[in-house]
Design a protein with these regions (language model features):
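Hydrophobic alpha-helical segments within soluble ligand-binding/sensing domains
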Residues: 168-194, 231-239, 297-317
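N-terminal helix-turn-helix DNA-binding module of bacterial transcription factors
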Residues: 1-65
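Short beta-strand elements in bilobed, periplasmic/extracellular small-molecule ligand-binding domains
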Residues: 96-108, 193, 209, 213-234
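Alpha-helical recognition/docking segments in bacterial nutrient-uptake
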Residues: 1, 5, 62-181, 240-246, ...
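Flexible loop/turn connectors
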Residues: 238-344
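An alpha-beta-alpha
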Residues: 177-221, 324-338
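Short acidic capping loops at alpha-helix termini that bridge into adjacent secondary structure
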Residues: 189-190, 223-226, 271-277
């Protein structure tokens, strides 16, 4: 396969070589270039598979030993951006130290510019890239483009990756199932699943819902349609509690949703867990402050971060991709938001 040169990108984009150089180098002069031209050049570079010379030199000679990180902090509404992604970032910084790496290079994500951004990961500054999945469509596109580059890549929080990409994820299905099994052991038989939006547009939340369903079915309990609530609203919570057979526990697919549910229940003068038990998922940094101490499925963020760093360094060293794919177990953090169901 012929090496794509800067002049090829220029011809494809219909601009001069100097314009391509300014745009792809990120020089200050490119600020005078119209945005539509910048986007066209970056798109051409990605489509042609252009790789800056610095990358080839780095791969042939020495490595920087620096790891790039792409997080989804811009795509998560607060306060989730300050909890889950913040925890991942701290975990990855600690993981770099554990793996004796000098540090991480964090790449801010620009909205709607996944294709345009690919070239910045290929400038030779980093030896490999970690991509934390938060918005599947964007990450799928980014991973697909990077899969054809020489840059080793490991995805965090997804298993839907190209053949050349490693990953680290947790077992979302088993985690949700464990949470429901705990409620069943306490005596609950009418357990609602309350989510802010339909499956959050992410496969993980579908897996959590399926884990919820299967745990009930395994106990010969058929999940009822009215137990599945989309949208955390006062009237919807009231409807759950006014069913002919009211629910006695609520499971949410993340802790932010659990906090919103807790706020509504408390505004209705209901007590957690005396009136309703509540379980979340993630075990975010403030989970112990939700509902007097939220029982939740714990994602081992530090372990995920270390494993991701190890998987990536293994890929950089030439290990097979299959050896850089890991699914970790979750655990249940039991606190104060669950109790046996109230006597009817």
């Amino acid at each position: 396969m012929a090496v794509v040169k800067m002049r090829d990108v220029a011809a494809h984009a219909g601009v001069s070589v100097s314009t391509v150089s300014k745009i792809l180098s990120g020089s200050a002069a490119s600020s005078q270039i119209p945005m539509h031209t910048i986007e066209r050049v970056r798109l051409s570079a990605s489509q042609l598979g252009y790789i800056p010379n610095a990358v080839a030199r780095s791969l042939r000679t020495q490595r920087t030993r620096e790891i790039g990180v792409v997080l989804g902090m811009e795509t998560y509404p607060e306060p989730a951006a300050l909890t889950l992604d913040g925890a991942f970032l701290l975990g990855l910084i600690n993981a770099a130290a554990i793996c004796h790496l000098p540090g991480v290079v964090v790449y801010p994500r620009e909205e709607n510019s996944v294709i345009a951004d690919v070239s910045r990961y290929l400038d030779g500054r980093i030896d490999g890239l970690l991509v934390r999945s938060s918005t599947p469509h964007q990450e799928e596109q980014l991973l697909r483009l990077l899969a054809n580059s020489p840059l080793p890549v490991v995805a965090i929080w997804t298993q839907d990756v190209p053949a050349t990409v490693g990953y680290v994820d947790v077992d979302h299905f088993a985690g949700a199932s464990q949470a429901i099994q705990y409620l069943l052991e306490l005596g609950h038989r009418r357990i609602a699943y309350v989510e802010p939006a339909p499956m959050f547009e992410h496969p993980h939340f579908l897996a959590r819902y399926q884990g919820y369903q299967q745990a009930l079915i395994d106990e010969q309990i058929q999940p009822r349609p009215e137990w599945h609530v989309v949208g955390i609203e006062r009237e919807k919570m009231r409807a759950l509690l006014r069913l002919p057979e009211p629910i006695t526990a609520i499971f949410t697919p993340n802790d932010i949703a659990a906090g919103e549910v807790a706020t509504i229940l408390q505004s209705m003068h209901l007590h957690i867990p005396a009136d309703v038990s509540l379980v979340g998922f993630d075990d975010i940094v403030n989970a112990h402050l939700i509902a007097g101490g939220l029982t939740t499925v714990h994602q081992p963020i530090q372990q995920i971060s270390v494993q991701a760093m190890r998987n990536l360094t293994a890929l950089i060293a030439g290990a097979p991709v299959a050896e850089s794919r890991t699914v970790l177990a979750t655990s249940l953090a039991i606190r104060n938001s669950c109790a046996p169901p109230p006597v009817q």
